[in-house]
Amino acid sequence: MRNILLVTKGHPYERQPFYQIFDDMPDVDYTLVEQPAAQALFSIEEGRAYDAYVLYDMPGIRFRPDRAPDFLEPPARYRQNFEALIEAGHGFVFLHHAIAGWPAWEGYAEILGGRFLYMPGSLRGLPRQDSGYRHRVTHNVQVVADHPVTADVPRSFSITDELYLFEVFEDDVQPLLRSDYVFTQDNFYSATKAVVEQKLFNNDGWRHDPGTNLMGWTRTIGKSRIVYL
């Protein structure tokens, strides 16, 4: 039996279908904890109870109805404990919108291997546009690497999901899954327009470089194996 800590909150999601994914795994026992309470379980001592942390959260952002969101620094103790877990070799799986978490902590993008930007900013010292999103996209996904994460996954499959036009450090990750969707600005909507101007599904005047079709990857940082899906 594998024990995982499942961390959520910060972005809406369909709760019961999501929990059912883990309920249907006969060899997995999970403990569900929401942010910020979950931060107390990020330590070497607490981590001994779990084989991996699975993060479906989006901490560090406070959305405002009339202006840009606030980006919050992670508590110093939590950040230190998180980095200690990475150095010690703990396993982490980050899911979907988790890549937008802790935007004020640049090192968080280095852990995940990329970032979704709600606002224009800088990444690795370079200016970057705000990221794009597109809901309910039906597309085909290809498995591009033999890896334990993709074991028993069909080499090609169709899925309907929200896609991102975001930043991925492709040179620093091992690709696992790629999409056949076209990741260009015309096919996505501006994240900044959504959260600042309250204009959903809008890309008027928005410009963004073509992006990666990478949907899932793994990387090693410190002694930890990191997976993003």
Language-model features: where?
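Aromatic-Pro/Gly-enriched surface loop or interdomain linker
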Residues: 1-52, 59
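Beta-strand-turn-beta hairpins that frame and shape the catalytic cleft
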Residues: 1-2, 220-227
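An acidic, glycine-rich "communication" segment
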Residues: 2, 95-191
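Short hydrophobic segments within beta-strands
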Residues: 7-8, 95, 229
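Solvent-exposed loop/turn segments at secondary-structure junctions
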Residues: 11-12, 37-38, 59-62, 98-102, ...
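Short alpha-beta junction capping motif
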Residues: 47-105, 223
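Short, surface-exposed beta-strand/loop micro-motifs that present aromatic residues
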Residues: 162-165, 205, 211-220
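Short, surface-exposed loop/helix-turn segments at secondary-structure junctions
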Residues: 187-208
